[in-house]
Design a protein with these regions (language model features):
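Short solvent-exposed loop/turn micro-motifs enriched in small/polar/acidic residues
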Residues: 55-57, 99-100, 119-121, 163
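Long, charge-dense accessory insertions within large macromolecular proteins
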Residues: 2-86
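Mobile "lid/hinge" segments at catalytic clefts and subdomain interfaces of large enzymes
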Residues: 134-167
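Regulatory sensory and allosteric helical modules in signal-transduction proteins
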Residues: 67-74, 86-111
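A short, polar/charged loop-to-alpha-helix boundary motif
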Residues: 80-91, 146-155
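GAF sensory domains
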Residues: 108-111, 119-125
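A short, hydrophobic, proline-anchored segment that marks a local hinge/packing element in signaling
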Residues: 121-131, 140
Length: 167
């Protein structure tokens, strides 16, 4: 990843609002709903996966990122994947118009040059819109896949000359 792109993806986002127009009970209900969505998404991914890396070692995570690329909620799982989710999603947000995001879209990424951690960590994310078509948040799932193809089994090749031979 270029230094410039890395700087943009990791840059601090605008501060969160310091005032709220909703009461604390409603805010806690929303927080609980976000937490449940993340927990159930990560749990379902673990149950549905055939890879022991995902279903036994739990190298997976789910998160919700707001429309500005800020982490809104993360599930219990592998902590570093929560932050890689954010980076991949931020890259998607930077290129949103290029890919014509819309309701029902789902994106998959694993490229370290575009926000990913390393090739075996796949990020699947989809935008969530309100009834007016405004982007509210992005639901993300990330998991480590044992083999991504490439020159050597396992996705790690010491003599890889490019991303394609690495896998």
């Amino acid at each position: 990843m270029s230094f410039e792109l890395n700087r943009k993806l990791a840059a601090k986002r605008d501060p969160l609002p310091t005032t709220a127009s909703i009461d604390s009970v409603t805010a806690d209900i929303i927080r609980g709903a976000f937490e449940t969505v993340c927990f159930e998404s990560a749990t379902f991914l673990g149950r549905a996966a055939s890879s022991p890396i995902i279903n036994s070692s739990n190298e997976r995570n789910a998160a919700i990122v707001d429309a500005h690329g800020r982490l809104a909620m993360g599930a219990v799982g592998t902590p570093h994947l929560t932050f890689v989710n954010q980076m991949e999603t931020r890259w998607g947000l930077m290129n949103q118009e290029r890919y014509d995001w819309g309701p029902g879209d789902v994106f998959v990424g694993n490229d370290p040059d575009h926000g990913g951690g390393h090739l075996p960590d796949y990020c699947v994310y989809g935008p969530v819109y309100d009834d007016k078509g405004e982007l509210i948040c992005i639901q993300t799932l990330q998991a480590h896949q044992g083999d991504t193809g490439g020159k050597d089994a396992g996705g790690f090749s010491l003599d890889a000359v490019d991303i394609f031979t690495e896998g």
